[in-house]
Amino acid sequence: MTSLDSILADKYPAKAHARRVAEGLKALGHSGGAIYLEAQKTRLIEDNDEPVPFRQRRPFFYLSGCLLPDSSLVYNIDSDQLTLFIPPINPDDVIWSGLPLSAAEALERYDVDNVLETTEVNATLANIAASHANNSTAFAIAEQVSEGTKFEGFSETNFNVLKGVIERTRVVKDSYEIALLRKANDISAKGHIAAIKASKSATNEREIEAAFIATCIANGAREQSYHPIVACGQNGATLHYGKNDEDLIDPVTNRRKDNVLIDAGAEYRTYCADITRAFPLNGKFLPETRQIYEIVLRMQLECIDMLKEGVQWEDVHAHAHRVAIRGLLELGILRGSEDELFDKRISVAFFPHGLGHYLGMDTHDTGGNPNYEDTDTMFRYLRVRGRLPAGSVITVEPGIYFCRFIIEPFLKNPDLQKYIDVGTLNRYWRVGGVRIEDNVHITKDGHDNLTTAPKTIEEVESLAA
């Protein structure tokens, strides 16, 4: 058993998470009471009898580690008792699905103090309220409370603060969560290698996607963090391209297209990987694509080197733009001085998105405090604002794209068109887009890159050859 697997053989640290959330509530002036959370409900697709694909509610999982639907939990803050409630046995369900997890098995599996049936929720809540002389608060998330759940005896039911406290608490991961994210990355790296190898015989984007997903499932990750992006040729200029169904053969030239951008990550026990790579379809990058790849890789490596506890994320993002500007100046795509191009935000035409986002149980994880109303186009789509704490995990995903819809308004703007050399630019449209994305754990001493998928030009070309 590897050290990673030995860590994950222990229970998910739900009790520690409950305590941290309680501390977050106390920091806001709320003392004592009870936290109540519900799992995702079993639901059917609206027009047939098949279930909606199950995705556990993240607040519930964070305080339970439990993937069972139709469950709930109560954390008594004052007595430090965490109780999990699981559905009673339904004989009709047993006919089709077999016996569910028993209370004894659940107590053995999860980091909780008690396991009861969901029929005991209201009585348990009432007992907690009575033990505080009916002078305490129940904390819950309004849109995640079943109609039959009652908070009798509590002097207040607060639906306003719990969700935000959990989301802020989730930013800083413990060692178990880092192990889950590392496992998701390890599986995803295998998927990316398989996808690149599959491209050699593939004739359509969907075959590359299939190789990635199949490898993830075979290695223990049945779910994807998000729908994979597999974009060949100029499709790579679309940031969240989702079709994944275009032929790899150009119908005009009858030749294979130049390159593929794949953005894909496995989800392992609710924790997400988010990795992007670009690779050639013909074994070697074209000169123009190689030049752009070198710039993007330099953007990423320099930004990763800046990462440590307390670094201002906006500064790292701005540095990525400066590296992009220098590279595009060297190629002759941009004209002018670095400072003028930066101040005029010309690089936004080629790098329109944020450098990265928090990562955890959600791909775009909680706590980033973005400002999508920012009038500064360089920072509008930056999903994390502020200083990075130790224990956070963030993606570093610079990119350069040749998207006509984004670039042409700059070319038509009388004040901005002079900064872009159209003649040189025309040689690069076929590149589409290059993005390189890793998942990085911020530590007190610096950082730890969780992503092992190959990314040097030599590594990628060797796999694609």
From Swiss-Prot:
Signal sequence interval, chain numbering: none
Domain of life, per lineage: Eukaryota
Keywords, sorted A to Z: Aminopeptidase, Hydrolase, Manganese, Metal-binding, Metalloprotease, Protease
Catalyzed reactions per annotation: Release of any N-terminal amino acid, including proline, that is linked to proline, even from a dipeptide or tripeptide
A molecular function (GO) term: peptidase activity
Cofactor: how bound: Binds 2 manganese ions per subunit.
Enzyme nomenclature, EC number: 3.4.11.9
Binding site for Mn(2+) 1: D274, E397, E437
Entry binding sites for Mn(2+) 2: D263, D274, E437
Cysteine pairings via disulfide bonds: none
Cofactor section: Mn(2+)
A Gene Ontology biological process term: proteolysis
Claim: Chaperone is one of the keywords in the record: no
Any Pfam family matching the protein: Peptidase_M24
Homology family: Belongs to the peptidase M24B family.
Described function: Catalyzes the removal of a penultimate prolyl residue from the N-termini of peptides.
Record-linked PANTHER family: XAA-PRO AMINOPEPTIDASE 3, XAA-PRO DIPEPTIDASE
Full protein name: Probable Xaa-Pro aminopeptidase pepP
Organism for this UniProt entry: Emericella nidulans (strain FGSC A4 / ATCC 38163 / CBS 112.46 / NRRL 194 / M139) (Aspergillus nidulans)
